[in-house]
Amino acid sequence: LKRFFADGTTGDYIFLVDEAHNLVERSREMYSAIIYKEDFLLAKKILKKYGQAKLMRELEKCNRVLLSYKRECEKYVIYESIGNFAFELMNVASDLDEFLQKAPEFPERKDLSEFYLNLRNFLNIYELLDDHYVVYAEHEQDGRFKLKLYCVDPSKNLQERINKGNATIFFSATLLPVGYYKSLLSTETDNYAVYAKTAFREEQKLLLLGNDVSSKYTRRSAGEFERIASYVKKTTDAKKGNYMVFFPSYKMMQQVCDVFLEKCQSDPSCETETLIQQPGMKEEERESFLQAFSEKLSGERKGSLAAFCVMGGIFGEGIDLKNEQLIGAIVV
């Protein structure tokens, strides 16, 4: 890829970006950077073993700055500028680079190299800072204190990459509101959007909402799982066919599935077959999982199929179940 897209290189390329709704958040993180105060103390501790007094002093300067940020931060603090601190970081990066090149192998080389690379990335992102960024400090839940260069609007950075080709097509089933995505994926103002009609007929759609249940962590209980499982069973009993039931986590999926299976076992008329997605499924296991959706069509199943899956997982997108192979989706 470097051969095609080195600095200053362009070509007759068309970039096709699938699932483009994910690109905004991924670009934000890609063009953002974080440093942790605790990492400076760890690096200082390592370098003390090897008599690197100058580097230790430079790391201590950075630690003192981060300590001052930490003391004034209750939850988070936004900074207009960190120019002086960035200069101190440059000194550390330069001398640490020299040390790593000259030093023989030592047990902590991997840890120190990771610290150096993270520091370099932070400084590289610092060079990109403009009004599309926010610089803030925050206490994380695990107690660590971080300083983050957060790319709120990645459009400028993405446009530099887009300009390396002749055209870019962003496509997704969920690029709405389209104005929001257009403003964050490109700086051009004359981009246009094409809306493709759904292949499904409106009269064939039935949208049902269960407003008395929630997937919030604070709401998760035996009673909540009972109500969700009841909704799943009522749906699969009402119309024979193949369904996918999506959950936010493996744990919640298993908890509701257990209740659902108990309900089916206690109901003699229930002929619903159940599948459940497993973590780290191999290719043959995935194929077997999907093959079950075609069995009903060949008369091998008496009742419905309820496939319990995890949202954002391997069965959440990129599969092609045609016609009656999938008649409904339940999203918890």
Regions found by a protein language model. Give the residues of each.
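Conserved coupling segment at the C-terminus of the helicase ATP-binding
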Residues: K2-M244, P248-S269
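Residue-level signal for alpha-helix termini/capping positions
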Residues: N163, D237, S294, S298-R301, ...
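A short beta-strand element within the Helicase C-terminal
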Residues: I319-V332
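Conserved motor-coupling elements within RecA-like helicase/translocase cores
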Residues: S266-C309
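Generic beta-strand/beta-sheet core signal
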Residues: V17, F171, N211, F246-P248, ...
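Short coil/turn connectors at secondary-structure junctions
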Residues: T10-D12, G165-N166, K302-S304, Q325-I327
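Conserved RecA-like ASCE ATPase "motif II neighborhood" in helicase/translocase motors
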Residues: L1-G11, F289, V310-F315
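Extended, charge-rich low-complexity interaction segments
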Residues: R227, V232, G299-E317
